[in-house]
A protein has these predicted regions:
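Disordered, low-complexity "stalk" and linker segments at domain junctions of extracellular
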Residues: 301-439
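Flexible, glycine/threonine- and acidic-rich loop/arm segments that mediate assembly and lattice contacts
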Residues: 1-311, 339, 366-371, 421, ...
């Protein structure tokens, strides 16, 4: 019901009175700007009230927890090298005869290197914008520098987890990629000569990875992760890092178990209810709960999504058999048999293409099956793809226009021809290693011996030459995350929402 629905009500005393009432009500809603070039009886004299402070709808810098709290080191070249102590020596016989010289054994080291990458965004403020009086006396140029700095650091914090130089060469290797390669190398001695399937098998079967199987985070998972870090890989723990929804679901599990004692002071009247967990106590010490809303971000898309950039690649082309189930002894669909939908997009450093539907109807997958997907590179286009992103729905009964597809993994374009994760040539296999719509968590000790952000160039502003009535500038950051001891970090994967309310 709005004011115009009262036009024919007799209570207003006829159409003339109604028109006068409406005129008065409308006048109160108009501003001086709306009276421009009109003869009026004073409404144009109104002066608008403008709040002097900008209400920031986006995130703030203090929400970038992983980037802010990761130890920083200034490096002096784009390539940084370091040594890992692999083994104190061989396990030799230590007992000797009286006066006998003990057996000799050498310490073993591994020489490693990592390359700094170059990140930045450009901003511009016109000369009129810098001359105009703005809310709160704000300097528009200063404000725009702050905005672009926050934007760049937010994007870096987001990419700290999922960046992969094998998919986009200009990216650094993020935490998940370094963790995968480091854990596989620690467990197997080296990843040299290993296929993608062998590396994935080694990683997801490692003691440094725990699969929650779409369940919520529990004390048992945290305890197991702490045990793996301390007793398997000789590490320490002081924190667990994940997305807010993971800890939100974690505390919900305890809400229904709260007991209210009637009659006890502050139990009912004036009580504080709910659950807030700042630390989780394990057998091996206390771990602080660290929440980062940009940690392990996997945003869903719909089949109708469009390209994210004019420089994004074209849409992939469907193969002979877009999707088909295959029997597989390595599948992780054992507990997740059901029907699913698939999409694929092509991606480069500029953006992502519109998706190609690989399933026209929901595809039924049994507990002993995996899914093979087939597609080829886009035809034509000025910007070629460097990788492909595979999307899958959660378990569904039918696919509709509103169905959401979640990114589950990304493959380099160079790996498509040979087949991915055990699939035949030109095909990609989904073994449900990552469950759609889930998150990860990391448990580790945040120390410069474990991880650092190596800064070849700290975040700074570079002004461009003035060639027009505007000021242009770039906010730059040169650096890369580095996991020195990746196996001393335990990753809990596939944290979902099953188990809530149980």
């Amino acid at each position: 019901m709005d004011l115009y629905n009262y036009n024919d009500l007799a209570a207003f005393g006829g159409a003339g009175n109604v028109a006068d009432v409406l005129k008065a009500m409308e006048a109160g809603l108009q501003t001086g700007m709306q009276y421009n070039d009109q003869i009026n009886n004073g409404g144009g004299l109104k002066v608008e009230s403008l709040d002097a402070y900008i209400k920031v709808l986006a995130n703030r810098l203090n929400q970038l927890v992983v980037y802010n709290e990761m130890p920083k080191q200034r490096i002096e070249n784009t390539v940084h090298q370091y040594n890992q102590l692999y083994k104190y020596g061989e396990e030799i016989g230590i007992f000797n005869l009286e006066g006998e010289t003990p057996e000799e054994t050498d310490t073993q080291y591994i020489r490693k290197s990592i390359i700094s990458k170059f990140m930045g965004v450009t901003g511009q403020v016109t000369d009129p914008a810098m001359l105009a009086k703005l809310a709160g006396g704000m300097n528009m140029y200063t404000r725009e520098v702050q905005n672009k700095t926050t934007l760049l650091l937010t994007l870096i914090d987001t990419r700290l987890t999922d960046a992969d130089s094998t998919c986009i060469a200009e990216q650094f290797d993020g935490i998940f990629r370094q963790h995968m390669m480091g854990v596989a190398a620690t467990d197997r001695g080296s990843t040299e000569g290993m296929s993608t399937e062998q590396i994935l098998d080694a990683y997801y079967g490692s003691q440094a990875v725990i699969d929650a199987q779409n369940g919520i985070l529990t004390d048992a998972l945290v305890e197991d992760a702490a045990d793996r870090v301390v007793n398997v890989y000789n590490g320490y723990i002081d924190r667990i890092v994940s997305a807010p929804v993971v800890f939100n679901n974690y505390v919900k599990k305890f809400h229904e178990s709260k007991r209210v004692v009637v009659g006890m002071s502050n139990s009912v009247v004036g009580a504080t209810m709910g659950q807030s967990v700042n630390d989780i106590m394990t057998q091996f010490g206390k771990v602080a709960v660290k929440t980062d809303k940009f940690f392990d971000v996997r945003r869903p898309i719909k089949a109708s999504a469009t390209a994210s950039s004019p420089k994004a690649p074209g849409i992939p082309v469907a193969g002979g058999t877009k999707s088909a189930v295959v029997a597989d002894t390595k599948t992780n669909f054992v507990l997740h048999a059901g029907s699913y939908g698939y999409l694929v997009t092509a991606k480069n450093r500029y953006g992502e293409s519109a998706p190609l539907k690989l399933t026209d109807t929901a595809l039924a997958v049994a507990a002993n099956q995996s899914v093979d997907l087939q597609f080829t590179a886009p035809v034509g286009g000025a910007y070629a793809p460097t990788c492909y992103v595979i999307y899958r729905t959660k378990k569904v009964t039918a696919l509709t226009d509103t169905t959401e597809y979640y990114p589950i993994f990304t493959i380099p374009a160079s790996m498509l021809a040979a087949g991915y994760d055990g699939a035949a040539a030109t095909k990609v296999r989904d073994r449900n290693r990552i469950i759609a719509g889930t998150k990860s968590a990391l448990i580790y000790y945040n120390d410069s011996q474990i991880n650092e952000y190596l800064q070849f160039g700290d975040t700074r502003k570079l002004d461009f030459a003035i060639t027009a009535p505007s000021r242009r500038f770039a906010i730059l950051n040169y650096g890369t995350p580095c996991l020195y001891q990746p196996a001393k970090i335990c990753r809990i994967i596939n944290i979902g929402d099953e188990g809530l309310g149980a």
